[in-house]
Amino acid sequence: MFPQKITLWLYPLGLFANLFFGTAFCVQWFLIKKRGCSFVPKIFWHLSCSGAVLMICHGFIQSQYPIALLHSFNLIIYFRNLNIASSTPLPISKIVSLLVVSATAITLSFAIGTQYLPHMTWMASPNILHLNLPEANFLWQLIGCIGLTIFSLRFFIQWFYLEYKNQSSLPTPFWKASLVGGSICLIYFLRTGDIVNVLCYGCGLFPSLANLRIASREAIQKPFSCSCFISAGEHSGDTLGGNLLKEIHAKYPDIHCFGVGGPQMRAQNFCTLFSMEKFQISGFWEVLLALPKLWYRRRILYKTILKRNPQAVICIDFPDFHFLLIKKLRSLGYKGKIVHYVCPSIWAWRPSRKTTLEKYLDLLLLILPFEQKLFKDSPLRTVYIGHPLSETIKLFCPKQNWKERLHLPTDKPFVAAFPGSRHSDILRNLTIQVQAFQASDFASTHHLLVSSANPAYDHLILEILQQNRCLHSNIVPSQFRYELMRECDCALAKCGTIVLETALNLTPTIVTCQLRPLDTFLAKYIFNIILPAYSLPNIILGRTIFPEFIGGKKDFRYEDVAAALNILKTSQAQEKQKNACKDVYQAINESASTIKECLPFIFEASY
């Protein structure tokens, strides 16, 4: 429109316009800090109107049609925010008419100007620093238009809230559009060398980020809902979660519980966001491959928690995943109580996790007696509740005629096998358990009954039994595992919670855990996990009551397991293990609180 010298001389007009916008946002920011909540004063709209008028002029002077057009729209929306609070607000139809007239006037002005004025174009790229930049092609101009459109769209979002929600405010979608549009505009103006707009849009990102952070914190400060998030990622955690839900529903029937759980938790009217089975991964390589899915599920979980704002978050075992979730919740301002049920194995490896527990948790529930000493001088509130399995097994009433119901042979006694619940566990552990049974003295006198924790893997169990020609064998569903433990002469069990269950059922047991070569290497040489014992009964008593065979293929052979199994052929050896199992039960229940006694601290504000 103007000769180049005049255009360059008037170029700072855009800077003055943005000073008005910057001042408006500074005033709004100051009042937010002062009042402690989102607020948009009238002066914000007055300053914005002044800035918009200058930016429309700037758009004409610099031959930038999108800037002139979009700021003319914004000017009308600023006016509407002032007008709607007046005694004579205009009808919305007149505001729409003003937008149409404005768009028509700006477009016709540029159409005539580009036709008859030699210095005028639709979208110029001022380069007042005379940088050696090539002309922006159509693609870059399209990117610039998209950025400016998104950036200006924020006030149409604000207008929607104004008209239909009767809120003269700057909602969260406004700031999101500001952030996205402003970022695209910044990239475009960096490309074109437009230094004023680089400064303006670059600085303009800070109010967007700051207000989005405030909006996030305000969402957390809303009243807690009458709900509780509970997460269990493993079968043992599902058992603990099922017992916990029984106690919660009995004492606080109005509390809605949701989260991640398995069949036992779902049986307690538990609303699952993800089933526990989606988190069942073991071994370094499997975890590595599953990281994207785990990361996605973690994101869904923390967003849901922040949206629902439950009174408490209770994470059961599964520490590596749960620690990431807990840290994210605290970083985003979650103020509810966070409880971790089951202490991570800090006594075995990574003792630094104790600091993480103390920093993020309100309560840690301990289930093993020796863990109390670890937190003797800790500021973290801990409660030793004993292992819930001891009470479950104490109250357990065996099902009558369970063998007949499952059509199991009754002509011989039997040995039980508990290979684990995951596909990889069954593949490695059941193979060596079956081979050990076949090589032992029990093979000629006993049946082998294999406990199946997951019916989906029954076909795998059958394949392994057939491959090893174990003819005298059957599969027993996991719901009959306690009957199986109590009536078998002895058991082969994969290292884990199941070993504690066999101990509490007074079942003579041999512990096996065959690892992948990579897992063996990591455990021995990277994480330095070298302990005198690995199964819970042995750790609790501080002595070996169950023989352990843990490691890679080179660490032990099935013949070694068979030799240990043969020792249990005698009644004296079986009685010795059973007496030691009674000591385990006594150690677990000594000076233990109950989960019921912990619930008031979690759900009642007075605690």
Curated annotation (Swiss-Prot):
Residues 1-224 are annotated as: Unknown. It comes from the Bacteria. It catalyses: a lipid X + a UDP-2-N,3-O-bis[(3R)-3-hydroxyacyl]-alpha-D-glucosamine = a lipid A disaccharide + UDP + H(+). It is an enzyme of class 2 (transferase). One of its GO terms (molecular function) is lipid-A-disaccharide synthase activity. Transmembrane segments: none annotated. Condensation of UDP-2,3-diacylglucosamine and 2,3-diacylglucosamine-1-phosphate to form lipid A disaccharide, a precursor of lipid A, a phosphorylated glycolipid that anchors the lipopolysaccharide to the outer membrane of the cell. This is Lipid-A-disaccharide synthase.
